[in-house]
Swiss-Prot record:
Compartments reported by the entry: Membrane
UniProt name for this protein: Uncharacterized protein slr1128
Keywords on record: Membrane, Transmembrane, Transmembrane helix
Residues annotated as transmembrane: 3-23
Classification via SMART domains: PHB
Organism of derivation: Synechocystis sp. (strain ATCC 27184 / PCC 6803 / Kazusa)
InterPro entries in the cross-refs: Band7/mec-2_domain, Band_7, Band_7/SPFH_dom_sf, Band_7/stomatin-like_CS, Stomatin_HflK_fam
SUPFAM superfamilies xref list: Band 7/SPFH domain
Chief subcellular location: membrane
UniProt xrefs under Pfam families: Band_7
Length: 321
């Protein structure tokens, strides 16, 4: 009897101990009764029916991280690359996470790999490097929709490394080298072009300044010549005015004027004749003789100098011929 009582006491104590469940914060348990879902245990103190109830799933509701291994992908322009990613997710419905999919984390990894291959296959190689943010947003949206039936919320997806094959890397290196050389050649040609333009502009400005200087000099010369002619005209006008007054007031002024004109006429011929170069002068002997005779009548024969006498003799000889 005592043995039976002891056995009952141990069994009852064990049943009571297994029926008490303490759930930590941010954790949840799923309980089945006789093979079917019964209830969900929340953080705190919970009780179950011994033997009939069984905890079948324990999981946290905190955010978790899945490290996606490198995956081979083909871009839209048929370039082979490898890409890996990190996925941040958490369970929002414990019942769906257990009953809707058999192995939740494995299913998540395979789904992410499939989505990465799908999204990268829509882009060309250059776009995969420049549109990483857009790819992350697309992956997040697609994964969130696909995992919603599993009671999972995907909070963030980050592509980490996108690595082309070695052949593609070598080709990209050659392309970048060619681009750098092209940019250097363009910069050099632009510098030479700017230098030529600056030189041409400098020459043009110099020619403009030179032309303006010549123009100003020509204007100044013309103004000086104009002023000279004006002064000469004024002097001539004043001389003519004085001469007119003299001729009108003095009876002998006309004869003096004729003498001066005749003397200048003879001096002109003497000056031309003294030149070394040969020249031909067409003169009317009658005009010369009349001029000389006018001079002779004014000053008399004795007042003529030797040069004038020589000129008269030459004219006489010319007349005789």
């Amino acid at each position: 009897m005592e043995a039976f009582f002891l056995f009952f006491l141990v069994f009852f104590g064990s049943a009571i101990g297994t029926s008490v469940k303490i759930v930590n914060e941010k954790n949840e348990y799923l309980v089945e009764r006789l093979g079917s879902y019964n209830k969900k245990l929340t953080p705190g103190l919970n009780f179950t029916v011994p033997i009939l109830d069984r905890v079948v799933f324990k999981q946290t509701t905190r955010e978790k991280v899945i490290d996606i291994p490198p995956q081979s992908c083909i871009t839209k322009d048929n370039v082979a690359i490898t890409a890996d990613a990190v996925v941040y997710w958490r369970i929002i419905d414990m019942e769906k996470a257990y009953y809707k999919v058999e192995n939740l984390q494995s299913a998540m990894v395979n789904l992410v790999l499939t989505q990465i291959r799908s999204e990268i296959g829509k882009l060309e190689l250059d776009q995969t490097f420049t549109a990483r943010t857009e790819i992350n947003e697309l992956l997040l949206r697609e994964l969130d929709i696909s995992t919603d039936p599993w009671g999972v919320k995907v909070t963030r997806v980050e592509l980490r490394d996108i690595m082309p094959s070695k052949a593609v890397l070598d080709s990209m290196e050659l392309q970048m080298t060619a681009e750098r050389k092209k940019r250097a050649a363009i910069l050099t040609s632009e510098g030479q072009r700017d230098s030529a333009i600056n030189s041409a502009q400098g020459d043009a400005q110099a020619r403009v300044l030179e032309a303006e200087a010549k123009k100003k000099a020509a204007i100044l010369n013309a103004e000086a010549e104009q002023q000279k002619k004006v002064l000469e005209a004024k002097a001539t006008a004043e001389a003519l005015s004085i001469l007119t007054e003299k001729l009108s007031s003095d009876n002998h002024a006309r004869e003096a004027l004729q003498f001066l004109l005749a003397q200048q006429y003879l001096n002109m011929g003497t000056t031309i004749g003294s030149s070394d170069s040969s020249k031909v002068m067409f003169l009317d002997p009658r005009n010369i003789l009349s001029t000389l005779e006018g001079v002779r009548s004014i000053v008399g024969d004795g007042a003529l100098d030797e040069g004038l006498e020589a000129a008269l003799n030459k004219v006489d000889r010319h007349r005789a011929v």
